[in-house]
Structure formats: structure tokens, C-alpha cells
Amino acid sequence: MVLSDFTGVGVGFGFGVGCGFGVGWGFGGMPMNILGVGAGGGCGVGLGLGWGFGTAFGSHYRSSRLTFQGIELETADKREEVVANMSKNST
């Protein structure tokens, strides 16, 4: 496990439903001394698609073995050692 920074891009998809209600009042200045009161409400549905980029800090597993497309590669010396051990065990 190694703690390190990650950087990359991403795509996001979102959906939301919301309702709101508000009440407000206001007072007009000179020369309009008028008091106003208002109320309102509304509902909405939203759908969105977005992209972004950023960094994060976390942990991930890192192996010291050399791999190519998921196949672990070993050195020739290591392979010869394994073959020699197999031949000793079979006799």
C-alpha cells in the first residue's frame, strides 16, 4: 500500500428534484414609504451531465513486479532458477 496523490479527469451525471418556498418583505426608502410583502414557491426537475478534473489523496496497492497487460514478467535468471528447482523436486 502506498499513499500518494491521484490526478485525472472524470465525467458525471446528475438528476435532482426540488421544491422551495419563500416569504420576504421590503421597505421602500424616501420618498416611497411603502411596506411590501411577498410569497413565492416553485418546484423543479433537473438533469445534468458534466465533466471535470481534480486531484485526490489516498492509498492504492503498488507491486514491485513488472507487469504487461496483467501478466507478470520475470527476469531470465528468475525463470531459470524456478525451472532448476522444479527439476530437482521431480527427481
Swiss-Prot record:
Segments passing through the bilayer: 8-28, 34-54
Topology within the bilayer: Multi-pass membrane protein
Chief place where the protein resides: plastid
InterPro entries hit by this protein: TGD_Bridge_Protein (IPR053288)
Keywords carried by this UniProt record: Chloroplast, Lipid transport, Membrane, Plastid, Transmembrane, Transmembrane helix, Transport
Coiled coil: none
GO cellular component, one term: chloroplast membrane
GO terms assigned for molecular function: lipid transporter activity
Gene Ontology annotations of biological process type: endoplasmic reticulum to chloroplast transport; ER to chloroplast lipid transport; guard cell development; plastid inner membrane organization; plastid outer membrane organization
Keyword RNA-binding attributed: no
Function comment: Facilitates lipid transfer from the outer to the inner plastid envelope by bridging TGD4 with the TGD1,2,3 transport complex. Required for endoplasmic reticulum-to-plastid lipid trafficking as part of the eukaryotic pathway of thylakoid lipid assembly.
Subunit structure: Interacts with TGD1, TGD2, TGD3 and TGD4.
Full protein name: Protein TRIGALACTOSYLDIACYLGLYCEROL 5, chloroplastic
Source organism phylogeny: Eukaryota, Viridiplantae, Streptophyta, Embryophyta, Tracheophyta
